[in-house]
Amino acid sequence: MGQAVTTPLSLTLDHWKDVERTAHNLSVEVRKRRWVTFCSAEWPTFNVGWPRDGTFNPDIITQVKIKVFSPGPHGHPDQVPYIVTWEAIAVDPPPWVRPFVHPKPPLSLPPSAPSLPPEPPLSTPPQSSLYPALTSPLNTKPRPQVLPDSGGPLIDLLTEDPPPYRDPGPPSPDGNGDSGEVAPTEGAPDPSPMVSRLRGRKEPPVADSTTSQAFPLRLGGNGQYQYWPFSSSDLYNWKNNNPSFSEDPAKLTALIESVLLTHQPTWDDCQQLLGTLLTGEEKQRVLLEARKAVRGEDGRPTQLPNDINDAFPLERPDWDYNTQRGRNHLVHYRQLLLAGLQNAGRSPTNLAKVKGITQGPNESPSAFLERLKEAYRRYTPYDPEDPGQETNVAMSFIWQSAPDIGRKLERLEDLKSKTLGDLVREAEKIFNKRETPEEREERIRRETEEKEERRRAEDVQREKERDRRRHREMSKLLATVVSGQRQDRQGGERRRPQLDHDQCAYCKEKGHWARDCPKKPRGPRGPRPQASLLTLDD
């Protein structure tokens, strides 16, 4: 308790330098953020058993690789470097991965020559082994049955076939059939009535706490299915490493879908899984939606109680997983349970939540479309994959895309005839033509230099204009001064009083003119002073 759970994904992130070195040796490049996105969000949706926390299982990695390398529109070329790097780490594991890589079981070896764990010392009481009995070809003496310390009569897989699904094991005298069983390795699941009933607990020699190593149903060597329940560590990790159903129903639904696909749980396992990962109210809602999804013979949802109870019972059914009929019932039950999870995860209609989904600055159009479709599934009753809703999804995709992409999409010719796929391809072209950070820095630097040059040119032009304006104002001022002096002189002469026809202009007396004025001095007339003019140099 209190310790961080190590998963394949967290392990690679802790040794990211080694991951980058492996990718470099393969001549590819990987990014940490996309590494996390593909591992936890993309590859689990391929329905090949990939867990959200990653895995080093080469079979699952190969299935994901096939999906990634699929030709045509179903392929994912952008994920090729990541799955190739992950495969290289699993095939040729570095030292920090080797403890978490489990060797494949020797299925090709004959049953008489497998590698067996060493026998315990004689001084130590041997524990019950749940592995199939393997005898040496040279030793014809039957191997004695070894029982646990407790005296309870338990079913031993060494000598008997596992019981059918409905048939419980014989009751233990003390009421607990697992009281004397000791886990073969550390991290074994806690004892439970289911374990004591079916005697199916099995732990691998080296267990990874984040990846289940025991599927509930496995085909045994005798042709019958053997039952191994979920380990408590798996249930604990699933519950603590994922959000609640109310918080993020899509993520938890994807986890349960992966578990249903890879583990093939029984009816009891499904109830245990729902009881661990869901609250009581959430579980009831899921069961109700699953029962609504039951279809009749006509392929339509039915309301007949008998058909609903036969397909999705609320009480433990009598389904024997060793028969084809029982396995078919379990497969149908899991499908209905998954439909109930998907329907119960839909929130009340809230178009504001859908409109709030906008494309990030560095988000690809494909990733944005997936988030938009998920919002439609979560906050509306509409299916975004429905052809009737394609127009609404397309309009939301255009209006809520990045501003540069949205503007160009709106200007497309014959926009009404474009399908959603056409819009995504056009958006991808626009997104890929965006300038790189280096180009953006170069453009900003160039624009800054051009702006600075324009500013300097404007300053010079402004200074020249200021000088010309000052020169014109000074010229106007000087001209005004000169014209004012002239007007003063001319205006002074015009202000002389008007004389009568017989009045002297010199003495202002009547009866004579100025040339005959006796008061006017007689003598030579002096030169008239000239008015001085100011120039711009003065």
From Swiss-Prot:
SMART domains with a match to the protein in the record: ZnF_C2HC
UniProt motif (PPXY motif) ranges: 162-165
SUPFAM superfamilies noted in UniProt: Retroviral matrix proteins, Retrovirus capsid protein, N-terminal core domain, Retrovirus zinc finger-like domains
Lipidation positions, renumbered (N-myristoyl glycine): 2
Keywords: Capsid protein, Coiled coil, Host cell membrane, Host cytoplasm, Host endosome, Host membrane, Host-virus interaction, Lipoprotein, Membrane, Metal-binding, Myristate, Phosphoprotein, RNA-binding, Ubl conjugation, Viral budding, Viral budding via the host ESCRT complexes, Viral matrix protein, Viral nucleoprotein, Viral release from host cell, Virion, Zinc, Zinc-finger
Modified positions (Phosphoserine) in chain numbering: 192
Pro residues: compositionally biased ranges: 110-124, 161-173
Residue ranges of coiled coil: 438-478
Sequence segments annotated as region (Disordered): 110-218, 434-538
Motif LYPX(n)L motif boundaries: 130-134
Region: Interaction with host PIAS4, residue numbers: 345-393
GO cellular component: host cell plasma membrane; host multivesicular body; membrane; viral nucleocapsid
Site residues (Cleavage), renumbered to this chain: 131-132, 215-216, 478-479
The record's account of how the chain is modified after translation: RNA-binding phosphoprotein p12 is phosphorylated on serine residues.
Biased composition (Basic and acidic residues): 434-466, 486-519
Zn finger intervals (CCHC-type): 502-519
GO molecular function: RNA binding; structural constituent of virion; zinc ion binding
Motif, PTAP/PSAP motif: chain positions: 111-114
Region span, Interaction with host UBE2I: 430-435
Stored InterPro entries: G_retro_matrix, G_retro_matrix_sf, Gag_p12, Gag_P30, Retrov_capsid_N, Retroviral_Gag-Pol_poly, Retrovr_matrix, Znf_CCHC
Biological process according to GO: viral budding via host ESCRT complex
Protein name (record): Gag polyprotein
Organism: Friend murine leukemia virus (isolate FB29) (FrMLV)
Name of encoding gene: gag
